[in-house]
Design a protein with these regions (language model features):
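N-terminal intrinsically disordered, low-complexity, charge/repeat-rich segments that act as generic
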Residues: 1-8
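Glycine-rich active-site loops that engage anionic ligands at enzyme catalytic sites
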Residues: 14-285
Length: 285
């Protein structure tokens, strides 16, 4: 399996014996164009999102150079290519593979991406015979998937409007950061609910009671930042949960909400000049 961006490439060996369900799911998505980002808090790590929520299969207590991890909460594959590794959070970590070639290329890419926000990369698998997972037939999940596919490679129109939106004396910088923080909070809350349903710590009926007001709150916050499309989608999704009758349907819905929200979160992340802001702080702002 390879990840390519421009002239740079890296080869990944996935642990098919340790994480068979993960590998099967990933292969069903390939080939794919993915946003390759720098994990700013961690150090020598690049990561990219895939449109799939996959439960952990193989956990390890620490991270080493060359590790490839999958982070279910934000549907990201994480590539640890260098010696500076500061895990953002405690283990155990969901290990899915190893970098077998191309660490130097990833190091060069990281120097550009850390200031640029992200770069597009091509994620491919030499085995073209992998079966494709059929798309969910639910009308609710189908609409969310369609919206996610629309913004997967094309920046949402609302993102440009956000870059000039002003809120009082705080100006535009605060608008971008607050919108980003809202999306991050949404992701954590959706994941906690999904995790509770998946492991039967929360009943389906209780989860539905929690999800509806959660989605309406998410929609209201989107309206504040003039993000009309996700606001409309979240508000519409707040109605149907009462029709969900079992945990599988609810997890499917939550998975698609997680993927869609996280794609928005990454777009919002890309429009914040994190390192320019940091320079100002270091200069005594």
């Amino acid at each position: 399996t390879q990840i390519r961006s421009g002239k740079h490439r890296a080869s990944i060996e996935f642990f098919a014996d340790r994480v068979p369900k993960t590998v099967q799911k990933i292969r069903s998505l390939l080939p794919a164009t993915v946003p390759l980002c720098h994990a700013k808090f961690v150090g020598d790590e690049l990561m990219f999102m895939i449109p799939a929520v996959i439960d952990p299969e193989y956990l390890k207590s620490s991270i080493e150079t060359g590790d490839v991890l999958y982070y279910p909460i934000q549907q990201t594959i994480c590539l640890f290519f260098g010696d500076t590794i500061v895990p953002f959070g405690r283990g155990p970590f969901n290990a899915v593979g190893r970098i077998v070639d191309g660490s130097a290329d990833l190091r060069q890419l990281a120097k550009t991406i850390v200031h640029q926000g992200f770069q597009w990369a091509r994620f491919t698998q030499s085995d073209a015979s992998a079966e494709k997972t059929p798309a969910p037939l639910s009308e609710r999940t189908a609409e969310i998937i369609a919206e996610r596919q629309t913004i997967w490679q094309t920046a949402p129109l609302e993102l440009e409007n956000l870059k000039s939106l002003q809120k009082g004396r705080a100006g535009n910088a605060a608008v971008r950061v607050y919108a980003f923080a809202d999306a991050y909070r949404n992701q954590r809350n959706l994941w906690l609910l999904r995790d509770g349903v998946k492991h039967e710590n929360i009943t389906v009926e209780t989860a539905k009671l929690l999800l509806a007001p959660m989605l309406r709150e998410m929609a209201d916050r989107c309206d504040i930042w003039a993000l009309s499309t996700p606001g409309r989608l979240f508000r519409k999704a707040a109605g149907p949960p009462a029709e969900v009758t079992n945990s599988e349907e609810l997890v499917d819905l939550l998975d698609e909400l997680l993927i869609y929200n996280n794609r928005w979160w990454l777009w919002l992340d890309s429009c914040i000049p994190w390192f320019d802001l940091d320079v100002q702080l270091q200069n005594g702002f």
